[in-house]
Every structure is written in C-alpha cells, then in structure tokens.
C-alpha cells in the first residue's frame, strides 16, 4: 500500500497531529505557508546533490542484469519530454500553448540506473543534448541510440574517444559499400553485413577517414528488416542486433519515471 503525503497541507496536518511526538525531539509543527516558502527559496543544488548521493548508493547495491552477456559496459542514450504548465513556466515554452523540459539521459543498462541526466528546454535538439553528455561516457564502452542521433560530428567524437556505438541507419544516408555484403541465416534470424563509408558532403567534413559497418537484420517475429550502423569492426551481426534491443531499457526507464 502506498504511503506518503500528496500535498503540503497534508504534510502540515500530519505534523500538527503529532505534536506530542515532535516535542520529544525539540521540534514544532510547521504550517503550510512556511513549507511553501521554503520550497520556493530552496536552491535546486540541494536536490541535485541528494540525487547523486542516492545514485551512488544504489549503484553499488543493485545487482547487474547483464552479467557476462557483453564484454564492455553498455549504455543507452535518449531523451524524453516532461510537460509543464506554460502559465507557471513561461520560459519552458516549446509550442504555442505547451511548455516542457527535455531530459537527455545516459542509462547504465546493467543497473538500469541513469549515469547522468541533462535538463534543457524542450526546444533543445537531441544532438545538442547528447554532446553535453559525451564527457560522461567512459572510453571502451558501448552506447546504443536511435536514429534520431544520426549526426556525423557525434559519430566522430564517439569514435575518437574510443566508444563503440550502435544505432539505426537513416534511410537517406549517402554511403558507398567497401566490401561485398555477407548474407547468412542462423536460428535467430537472417543477417547481412558490409563495410562502408559515408559520401555526403556533411559526412566528409567529419567522417571521411572512418570506416563503418552496416548490419542488416531480419527479425523473424515481425518479418521486418533492420539496418544497424556501428563503428565497431569486432562485433558480430548477432551482437549488434542484441545490443540494439537493449535500447528498450531506456524506454522502460522513461515510462517508470512518468508514472
């Protein structure tokens, strides 16, 4: 059964109903207006510090769910929008009659806990938010992200940092294969892979010297083909497909925090 208070008035009423117990602590009840004033004046840094203390505590207490499934730490990168009342938060306007903030999140897939959350206005693009998270991604790890993060400068920065990424390839991405594709069938599905370079003008500014790999995967359950993009030359096609499935964990995380 859920316990707790839903409003400041409920908290205040609870304190006044426990005056006898409070007196033993040398404390008194606090009225609702005092609580409201304290909330409005209390700096956000207090809650930020408290959040990271709790995060560090649970990071060491929660047993990892991935075990030895992957040889490197796996993270998911994505964002979600939290709606706000535009009348109260005019600075958060992102549509004519709507307000909101965007949470750019790097999730640890082993613990299902966020490594870092960057808050911006909802107007901020996912790419810009992702670049603010880059310094928190450890070298030698794997980052899974959807194709909303198809950005050549982001690909280069991740590659230069020694971070492996797995994402969906955009349908209109200009590229040329470097090696003949390999097609194979296994119990989990049919797949093909080939090495490639991006050929678009914007891509040449950032990725002209980098070779990428495309994994084509047929999901037997849905009978759909998917094209995954990675900068790894070692991951197998099955591992790439399994890694992209891990991205679902961050969707579940967003669902939980919004409930």
Residue positions per predicted region:
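Extended, structured, electrostatic nucleic-acid-contact surfaces
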Residues: 16-25
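Extracellular beta-strand-rich solenoid/capping regions of secreted or surface-exposed proteins
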Residues: 92-94
């Amino acid at each position: 059964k859920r316990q707790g208070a839903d409003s400041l008035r409920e908290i205040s009423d609870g304190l006044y109903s426990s005056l006898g117990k409070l007196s033993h602590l040398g404390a008194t009840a606090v009225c609702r207006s005092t609580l409201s004033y304290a909330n409005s004046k209390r700096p956000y840094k207090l809650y930020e510090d408290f959040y990271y203390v709790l995060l560090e505590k649970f990071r060491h207490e929660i047993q990892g769910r991935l075990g030895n499934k992957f040889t490197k730490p796996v993270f998911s990168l994505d964002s979600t929008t939290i709606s706000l009342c535009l009348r109260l938060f005019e600075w958060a306007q992102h549509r004519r009659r709507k307000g909101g903030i965007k949470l750019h999140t790097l999730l640890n897939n082993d613990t299902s806990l966020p490594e870092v959350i960057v808050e911006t206005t909802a107007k901020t693009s996912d790419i810009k938010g992702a670049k603010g998270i880059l310094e928190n991604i450890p070298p030698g790890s794997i980052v899974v992200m959807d194709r909303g993060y198809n950005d050549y400068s982001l690909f280069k920065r991740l590659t230069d940092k020694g971070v492996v990424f797995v994402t969906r390839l955009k349908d209109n991405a200009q590229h040329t294969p470097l090696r003949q594709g390999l097609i194979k069938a296994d119990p989990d599905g049919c797949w093909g892979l080939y090495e490639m370079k991006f050929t678009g003008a914007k891509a040449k500014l950032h990725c002209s010297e980098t070779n990428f790999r495309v994994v084509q995967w047929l999901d037997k359950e849905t009978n759909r083909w998917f094209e995954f993009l990675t900068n790894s030359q070692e991951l197998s096609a099955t591992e790439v497909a399994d890694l992209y499935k891990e991205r679902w964990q961050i969707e579940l995380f967003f669902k939980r925090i919004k409930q």
